[in-house]
């Protein structure tokens, strides 16, 4: 009853409708991860699809835990608030570090993706400005950052939902275009692939985890929603749709290119085909649509460090957002390895913020760790699994990155 009363109190806060929240959540959960799932399947083999489904169920369950934690205290608005409610000031700091580092590296991955695909289409592109010459991927990363920048100046998620619609549409069109290429443009679905590749399982698992790493954004979406009692329905719809999309893309891409599948399926496509260009161009919409949504929690956190008379100023939001995208460009051009970077994010950060931290915070807030039951045993099992995956996956990702520098 107390939980219901808290939900009713919270219903008066927020401006986003059910459908707008759905679009924002779909935009956060879907996106560039869908381009890497064929590569993940190629690394792990057909049986690794079971890991994708297991992670989908696990991530959905932990998203419900986040909602329960927010309902435990009506003052909780963000993911770091959950950490503080559970473990005090140290909990807030730990959650903040992992959450914001994940969001930062994911958005950096957006720029790497853009640079890779645009360079594949236009290999001779260069930019000369104030005595500086940028070639190929570097030039495209800088150009895309300039295009994305205006979307960062909106801090209203209700407004951003309209941008999110374009991101969701782009993901759908990309999946449809790649299906068309396989069926009608001479590629076919003839590759048999391997049943399982044990050496590639850690990388596959890390990349699958990356696909479900949107948990840091969920408290922001929850706080922005009018009818918060419907948020669990939003999560269910979004996780089902995204998992169908991820599974479909993984199977189609692996059947098309087998062991030759690259870290982004769009890099395998024959660029002279119209359908390939449609897939690539629509793929390029996703970073534009997602960047602002993903970076909003980090920007809001930094704004809260300033005195209240400054934190509400529009120019502060503009300055912080602009700094973030400029620094993302620097990192992207220094380490332009999409597959390895996303594998690192998945293993070290997505597993932590999407599985480990929600379980630990829930156990502490509700005191479940004090009593042995089926739920407690399951949660501790998820904690052990996430630590194991995180350690092994992080080691392999760092090894691959260092070997490529």
UniProtKB/Swiss-Prot annotation:
Cysteine disulfide links: none
Subcellular locations according to the entry: Membrane
GO CC list: organelle membrane; plant-type vacuole
Keywords for the protein's UniProt record, in alphabetical order: Amino-acid transport, Membrane, Transmembrane, Transmembrane helix, Transport
Membrane topology: Multi-pass membrane protein
Pfam family, one: Aa_trans
One GO-annotated biological process of the protein: amino acid transport
Main localization category: membrane
Transmembrane regions listed in the UniProt entry: 22-42, 46-66, 93-113, 140-160, 169-189, 201-221, 234-254, 278-298, 318-338, 343-363, 377-397
Family named by the database record: Belongs to the amino acid/polyamine transporter 2 family. Amino acid/auxin permease (AAAP) (TC 2.A.18.5) subfamily.
Protein name: Amino acid transporter AVT1I
